[in-house]
Structures are given as C-alpha cells and as structure tokens.
C-alpha cells in the first residue's frame, strides 16, 4: 500500500501514466465462475492469505481515488497465475515447485485433493496484455483481467510436468491450507474488446516445455 501511495504521488507530480499490477486474488474464493471484472469477490479479510489480497484491493481503491480526485492517468490490470522462463526456482509458486521437484525426481506435493483449479498464463502473453493496456486511451482505465482461460486441476498440472520431464516423481498429498481458492478462471471478454483483440497465444503444454528447458539449463 505504501508503494502504491508513493508511486501515485509521483505520477501526480510529474503527470505520468501509471499501471497497477493487481491480481486475481482480489476475487478471493470465487462463487462466480469464470470471474468477470464486475464481480466483487468472495473474500475473508482476516484469513491467513488475506494480507496480500487485501493489500491489492486497497491499492486498487487508492488508484481509483487518485484518478477521481486528482486526475491521475491510471490503468489497472488483474493478473492471473503467470509462469515462464526466468522464474525463481525457489519462489514457492506451484509451477516452479512442480518443475523443480520433477527434475530432481522428488515427490510432487499437492495440497488437498488436487481437484482445485487454476488458469496458467505464459509470461509473453502477460507482457503483451500489459503493453496493449498502456496503449489504450485515457477513457479506459480498467480493471481488466489478464489471464489464460484454460483451466486445469492441480493433479492435471502435476501429471503434465511429470510427463514433460520424464520424471520418476510420485504425487503425494498434504493438508490443504486455509482459505485456498477452489477455482480460478478469468473472463477475458473485456480484454479482448478493449485491448485490440488480445488473447493468450501460448497454451499450457508449450509454455511448460519452454519453462522446463530454462530450469534444466539453470539447475
């Protein structure tokens, strides 16, 4: 939140256009599927995951307030799960975790049943969406979902990684952390309309192959 306030203050002073990289986490554990930008979310503001989620929601509020009260030129995007080469192998995200475990032939850890779903977006598609968002006119500020609507369970993701790495890993299940969303999928209709027909070009298997190659070369 402090970072948002500082950069908004700077944008106000120098009359700069500013982009907020918000997140699909603002939707919480959604009861609407897929999630459009008009959905206000199903959130727990005091849960163990809520600090990040609520920080992003508060930042969106600050961006809108600076836009309404000070005329700051803002853009807001809501980024869904993104992966690709140059990820930190130890960043704790599910794609990097699964790939590293598979390359080392370690057990792949899935929390809960593994039937919870996510939508995975390749980094190049995200960058293209961000670039197009910044090129839109001042009459469109967002928020707009930037994500891949392809939806996969954690079990499906784990099996794809095992197959693509020819790994001997087994899948093990651990207790599900509290407040873990059961499903996540973007409605990208608005992005397609406002961002010059933007939609993801790299599907999961192709993106995983590129990411696995990078990790293999940097182990």
Annotate the PLM regions.
Residues 1-82, 102, 112, 124-127, ...:
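N-terminal Rossmann-like NAD(P)+-binding domain of SDR-like oxidoreductases, especially those catalyzing
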Residues 31, 47, 87-91, 150, ...:
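Residue-level signature of the cytosolic catalytic core of signaling kinases
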Residues 4-7, 61, 95-96, 158, ...:
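A generic local structural motif
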Residues 5, 30, 86-88, 94, ...:
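Gly/Ser/Thr-rich beta-alpha loop segments that engage phosphate groups in nucleotides
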Residues 36-38, 93-94, 189-190:
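Short, hinge-like loop/turn segments at secondary-structure boundaries
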Residues 81, 100-219:
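C-terminal substrate-binding subdomain of Rossmann-fold SDR/epimerase-dehydratase oxidoreductases
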Residues 44, 48-57, 88, 92-93, ...:
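Short-chain dehydrogenase/reductase
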């Amino acid at each position: 939140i402090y970072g948002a306030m500082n950069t908004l203050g700077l944008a106000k002073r120098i009359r700069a256009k500013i982009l907020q990289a918000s997140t699909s986490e603002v939707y919480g554990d959604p009861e609407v599927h897929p999630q459009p930008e008009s959905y206000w979310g199903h959130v727990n503001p005091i849960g163990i995951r809520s600090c990040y989620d609520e920080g992003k929601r508060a930042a969106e509020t600050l961006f809108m307030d600076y836009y309404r009260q000070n005329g700051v030129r803002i853009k807001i995007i809501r980024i869904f799960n993104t992966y690709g080469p140059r990820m930190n192998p130890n960043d704790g995200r599910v794609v990097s975790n699964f790939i590293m475990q598979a390359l080392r032939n370690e057990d792949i850890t899935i929390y809960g049943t593994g039937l919870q779903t996510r939508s995975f977006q390749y980094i190049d598609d995200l960058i293209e969406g961000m670039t197009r968002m910044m090129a839109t006119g001042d009459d469109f500020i967002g928020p707009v979902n930037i994500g891949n609507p392809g939806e996969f369970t954690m079990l499906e993701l784990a099996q794809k990684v095992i197959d693509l790495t020819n790994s001997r890993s087994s899948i093990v299940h651990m207790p599900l952390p509290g407040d873990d969303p059961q499903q996540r999928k973007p409605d990208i209709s608005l992005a397609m309309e406002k961002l010059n027909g933007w939609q993801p070009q790299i599907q999961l298997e192709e993106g995983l192959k590129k990411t696995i190659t990078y990790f293999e070369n940097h182990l």
